[in-house]
Amino acid sequence: KPKKAIADARATIAECIGALPEEIYFTSGGTESDNWAIKGSAFSDPYKRATITSSIEHHAVLRTCSAIESMGYPVTFVSPNRSGIITADALEELITENTRLVSIMFSNNEIGTIEPIKELVAIAHKHGALFHTDAVQAVGHIPINVQDLGIDMLSASAHKFNGPKGVGFLYIRNGTEIKPLNDGGSQERGLRAGTENIAEIVGMA
């Protein structure tokens, strides 16, 4: 029964964002998901080490980027225009062949802007970079289809769409190379160690 409950919840969450069930990894929330996406990407490629994010991200992203920067991983910050939008042209000016990850939030938690994710994904992929979006403010409120948008990773937190606190997920597109954040057991297909919080996972779905 517990395994079926988790599997059913995984399928429900996947359907909400246009993903496959095996692309959904349960976490403790948006902050863990952001940490995992950013650190897991940086640590996974010894040759492409740089990360680009925006100057108006949530602290979960900004402080994680500061952490990897202190470890010697280059981080560049792209600024929004006067309307609070990260434009494709602004990203194009900063991205290089050394860029491993571009991380831009889906919608801003303070000013409410919705970023042109599909355009930004296209720029990232043109240069061989992965694209992650912190969609904590968007999931459950804005229609999202990760396949249509081309997103590689997406973070979400249940309490932002009327679910319980302390649970969330990271969408990781099949084939994306990422290192685990935690060492330990084989939960979440060996990528996220730690006993699953079944009650909250079910509550999220």
Question: Whereabouts are the PLM-identified features?
Answer:
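Pyridoxal 5′-phosphate
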Residues: 1-205
